C-alpha cells in the first residue's frame, strides 16, 4: 500500500505564498511611490539673479547681455524669435572669433534678418538698419542642410514649422541663462515694455542647453522636460517649462498659480486668449482675490477682456505708444510667472516657448512695482 503524500502550498525560501505576494506588493509600492529624481530638491546655487525692465533698463540690459557674450569661454546657445540688432550680432561674431562655440536657432519667418544682421556685422557695419550687398550675402551664407546654414561662420538652424519658434533665451557656458520676453531687436530694448532675467544657475542652464540641443538637432518640438532650480541671491525657487512638448505641464503650472492665489493677481500681457486662464482669473476675483489685468492695446480685439469686465475684473489697456510685450503674472507678492510664453492656446499647443514659475518675495516685489507702475500709466476700459 503506497504512502499518500499531503499536498503542500508552494513556498519560497520557507515563506508561505501569501507572504511572498505581500512582500512583492510592498516592493512594487515602494518603487512606485518613492520620490523620483525630478521630485528631489535641486541644489541651492550661488549667484545674483538680475532682472531688467525695458525700456528704462534697456541700455543696462543690453550692456549686460553683451558682457555675457564677451565673457563666454566655451559656448553660447541662442534661441531667438526675432533678430535685428547689430550690437548683438557683433557680440556673437566676436565670441565665435575667440573660439567660443556659438550656435543659433531661429524662427524661419525671420531667416532673412538673421542673414542680414550677421553678415552686416561681419562687414563692420554699425548703422541701423544695415544695408548688405547681395554679393556679400551669397559669399557669407552657406547652406548646410534644408533647415540650417552657416551665416558669417555661425551655424544657424530654423524651425520651419507651422508654430512659432518663440524663444528669446541665451545659454552661456551652460552656467547661466538669459531669458524673458525681450526679442533680440533694437525696439525691444529701447521702446517696448519688456522684462529679462539673468539666472546664473548651472542646473537651469544645463536644462535650457538640453532643450536647445534637441531643437538644433532637429527635434522641432523640443524635449519638454521641466527644470527645477534654486538660487540664493535673492532666494529664488523656480521651475522652467518648455512647450510644445511640455506644453500641458506648462499650462497646468500657470493655471495652478492663479488657482492658489489668496490676495492678489496682477497681469501684464501682450495677449490674453486662453479661455481657461481667463476663467481662473474670474474665479479668483469671485473668491475675493484682487485681480488687475493690463493688456497691449492692439491686441484688445483678440483678447478676452469682455469676459473679465463682465465679471468685474478691472482691465486697462497699456499706455505705451509702442508695445507692451510682457507675459507676466505676479501673485500674492510672492510668485512670478514670466518667459516667452504668451497667454494663448498656441503657446502651449504649438509654439516653442519657455515659461518660468518663480517663488521669491524679493523678485515678486520688483515685478509687482513694475506692473503697478504700468497700470497707473494705462487707460481704463
What are these regions (language model features)?
Residues 1-13:
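N-terminal Lys/Arg-rich, disordered targeting/topogenic segments
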Residues 17-31:
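Hydrophobic membrane-insertion alpha-helices, especially the h-region
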Residues 32-73, 82-260, 275, 287-335, ...:
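HKD-type phospholipase D/PLD-like phosphodiesterase module
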Residues 373-381:
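Charge-patterned, long linear interaction tracts outside catalytic cores
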Amino acid at each position: 500500500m503506497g504512502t499518500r503524500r499531503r499536498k503542500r502550498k508552494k513556498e519560497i525560501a520557507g515563506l508561505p505564498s501569501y507572504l511572498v505576494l505581500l512582500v512583492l506588493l510592498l516592493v512594487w509600492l515602494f518603487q512606485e511611490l518613492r520620490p523620483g529624481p525630478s521630485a528631489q530638491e535641486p541644489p541651492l546655487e550661488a549667484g545674483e539673479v538680475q532682472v531688467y525692465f525695458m525700456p528704462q533698463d534697456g541700455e543696462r540690459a543690453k550692456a549686460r547681455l553683451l558682457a555675457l557674450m564677451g565673457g563666454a569661454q566655451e559656448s553660447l546657445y541662442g534661441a531667438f524669435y526675432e533678430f535685428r540688432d547689430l550690437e548683438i550680432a557683433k557680440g556673437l561674431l566676436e565670441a565665435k572669433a575667440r573660439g567660443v562655440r556659438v550656435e543659433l536657432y531661429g524662427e524661419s519667418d525671420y531667416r532673412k534678418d538673421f542673414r542680414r544682421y550677421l553678415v552686416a556685422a561681419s562687414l563692420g557695419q554699425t548703422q541701423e538698419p544695415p544695408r548688405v550687398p547681395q554679393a556679400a550675402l551669397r559669399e557669407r551664407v552657406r547652406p548646410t542642410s534644408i533647415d540650417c546654414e552657416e551665416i558669417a561662420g555661425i551655424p544657424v538652424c530654423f524651425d520651419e514649422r507651422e508654430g512659432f519658434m518663440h524663444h528669446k533665451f541665451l545659454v552661456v557656458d551652460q552656467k547661466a541663462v538669459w531669458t524673458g520676453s525681450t526679442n533680440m531687436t533694437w525696439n525691444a530694448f529701447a521702446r517696448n515694455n519688456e522684462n529679462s532675467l539673468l539666472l546664473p544657475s548651472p542646473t537651469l542652464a544645463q536644462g535650457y542647453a538640453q532643450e536647445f540641443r534637441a531643437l538644433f538637432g532637429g527635434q522641432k518640438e523640443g524635449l519638454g522636460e521641466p527644470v527645477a532650480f534654486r538660487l540664493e541671491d535673492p532666494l529664488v525657487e523656480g521651475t522652467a517649462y518648455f512647450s510644445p512638448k511640455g506644453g500641458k505641464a506648462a499650462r497646468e503650472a500657470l493655471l495652478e498659480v492663479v488657482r492658489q492665489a489668496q490676495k492678489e493677481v496682477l497681469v501684464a500681457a501682450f495677449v490674453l486668449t486662453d479661455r481657461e486662464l481667463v476663467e481662473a482669473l474670474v474665479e479668483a476675483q469671485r473668491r475675493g482675490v484682487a485681480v488687475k489685468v493690463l493688456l497691449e492695446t492692439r491686441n484688445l480685439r483678440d483678447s478676452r477682456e469682455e469676459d473679465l469686465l463682465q465679471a468685474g475684473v478691472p482691465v486697462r489697456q497699456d499706455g505705451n505708444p509702442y508695445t507692451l510685450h510682457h507675459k507676466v503674472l505676479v501673485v500674492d507678492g510672492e510668485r512670478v510667472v514670466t518667459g516667452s510664453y504668451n497667454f494663448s492656446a498656441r503657446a502651449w499647443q504649438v509654439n516653442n516657448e519657455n515659461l518660468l514659475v518663480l517663488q521669491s518675495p524679493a523678485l515678486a516685489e520688483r515685478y509687482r512695482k513694475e506692473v503697478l507702475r504700468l497700470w497707473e500709466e494705462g487707460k481704463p476700459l
